[in-house]
């Protein structure tokens, strides 16, 4: 999400690519006035892991080596080596570089920022843009005291090179434990496929 009023005042276009987002964040970033370019989940553990996984997708690579097909990536028939993490891929490297780029234009407490802190930073007017999720949208959309109230625009997450506009779901919390008994794996895999199916994602 982004502050429509701030971008308009600076004559900036809402960013649709990661490269454009860095440029807009840089131009809006003004720490002397207590204003920062972008808020995002960078706290240690799950918040940063979640950010990394969806940013890899924005650079064209799921977090595991899923096969590509006409509609995107085939997770329903993935098996074996296709389920290996892609942490040494070009997309993973680019996702890390991008996080280091936006870190420069983030609030001082960015390394302690997870979902609530990120939404609060944006809603309070501290940050001009944020990676948003609908769960905490009431902080923006229902609180008339928020500088972001009535001044917020929404975009799909910006894409990187080789990426495309997607909405990643799940990922970080959806996994099959390595120590799960073999007789339970198929049932858990079936449940995971159902939870991440197109019908459940709507």
What is each stretch, according to the model?
Residues 1, 8, 22-37, 50, ...:
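Pocket-flanking alpha-helical
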């Amino acid at each position: 999400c982004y502050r429509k009023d701030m971008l308009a005042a600076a004559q900036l276009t809402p960013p649709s690519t990661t490269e454009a987002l860095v440029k807009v964040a840089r131009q809006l970033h003004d720490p002397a006035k207590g204003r920062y370019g972008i808020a995002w989940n960078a706290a240690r553990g799950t918040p940063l892991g979640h950010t990394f996984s969806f940013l890899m997708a924005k650079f064209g690579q799921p977090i595991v080596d899923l096969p590509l097909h006409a509609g995107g990536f085939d997770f329903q028939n993935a098996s074996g080596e296709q389920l290996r993490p892609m942490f040494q891929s070009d997309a993973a490297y680019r996702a890390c570089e991008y996080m280091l780029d936006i870190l420069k234009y983030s609030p001082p407490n960015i390394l302690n920022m997870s979902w609530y802190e990120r939404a609060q930073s944006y809603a309070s007017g501290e940050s001009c843009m944020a990676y948003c999720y609908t769960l905490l949208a009431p902080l923006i959309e229902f609180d008339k005291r928020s500088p972001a109230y009535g001044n917020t625009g929404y975009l799909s997450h910006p894409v990187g090179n080789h990426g495309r506009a997607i909405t990643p779901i799940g990922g970080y919390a959806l996994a099959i434990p390595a120590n799960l008994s073999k007789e339970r794996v198929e049932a858990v895999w079936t449940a995971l496929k159902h939870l991440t199916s197109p019908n459940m994602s709507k």
